[in-house]
Amino acid sequence: MSTEDQAWPEPRASSLLVGQETAEATFLAACRSGKLPHAWLIAGPPGIGKASFAYRIARYALNGSIEGPAQDAGPSLFGDALPSSEGDSLTVDPDSIVFRQVAAGSHPDLLSVERGINERTKKERSEIVVEDARRVAGFLHKTASGSGWRVVVIDSVDEMNRNAANAILKILEEPPANALLLLVSHSPGRLLPTIRSRCRLLRLSPLGEADMDRLLAHYLPEETGENRLLLTRLSEGSIGGALALHAAGGMALYRDLVGLLAGLPDLEARKLHAFAGRFERAGNEDAFQTAMALLADWIARLARAKGLGQLPQPILAEEEPALRRLASLHSLDRWLELWEKVRHLTARTDAINLDRKQVVIGAFLALQGTG
């Protein structure tokens, strides 16, 4: 689904952010302390609002709401907790010039660093390269035109290659005055330790059911409460994940998956071939990826249950008998092998043009124990 068809705004244009009040209070407390770190590592699972939060901070700074210079976070500050704050907000009026400029990507004091376009292939790169990172140094040494702050959002820092990471590290080690760097990360543990140590870590949490329901009711007003709850549980508190699932027809796919899984270890060949056959057609690549991701997640839930010695909470009431029966079908090691196999097959399908129908059938035969 293209971004222009989305029913929800891009992070830079989003005015709605819920469930991250603790993180917001932490940043506001740092602003008032007079010791605002110049670099923030905004971390958490995908789809919970990290990039939206980064742009929320950017608007706040560019709106002239931060007084005093930024400070070097320094290695010793990485784990220190800041006092929380109550009663304030990072909200900037959506009708303001700053908000509109940030949303349009035209604010002169804001630089967004993302994966760029490969000039040779004209396709999006798979990583942020050193040329992207080098733009940051030149940008930060220019004179700010408005609030006095120059802000850089890197979304996501996980996608930087080593050369790009080293270029950003040099900036973090010697930041110019009134520079604010906001690094979005899904997996902070994989970053260079020296990058992590130069940033104030700000963890964002998956959203609770009430916050997810509020957001889904806003973005998907046509959906029932039952469907909103299904999306919430399937996405594990990720609003981005829930909206992407909805766009890909994930709810119907999950119900069909559960219908097939409920029959295991027996499989009805006609139903399996009908389900797998829908992914053969051109244009159904996203649906295939979604179905396989849902299947991998289902297997992962069973593997965790096997390790803990207790059944996972069913997402749909009708899947409980299948969970109970299948938990004893394989050992923990076998469930882990199946999880790896499904993920591996999914990754290789488009890379080497495997038959998507046969991949789905093969995955179910493996679950059955005959593949």
How should these model regions be labeled?
Residues 141, 166-180:
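Conserved catalytic/switch belt of AAA+ P-loop NTPases
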Residues 120-130, 157, 201:
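Flexible beta-alpha connector loops of hexameric P-loop NTPases
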Residues 26-31, 96, 100-101, 127-149, ...:
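Conserved alpha-helical scaffold flanking the Walker A/P-loop in AAA+ ATPase domains
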Residues 162-163, 193:
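Conserved D-loop-proximal element of ABC-family nucleotide-binding domains
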Residues 146-151, 176-182:
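Loop/turn-to-beta-strand initiation segments
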Residues 156-160, 172, 188:
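Conserved Walker B
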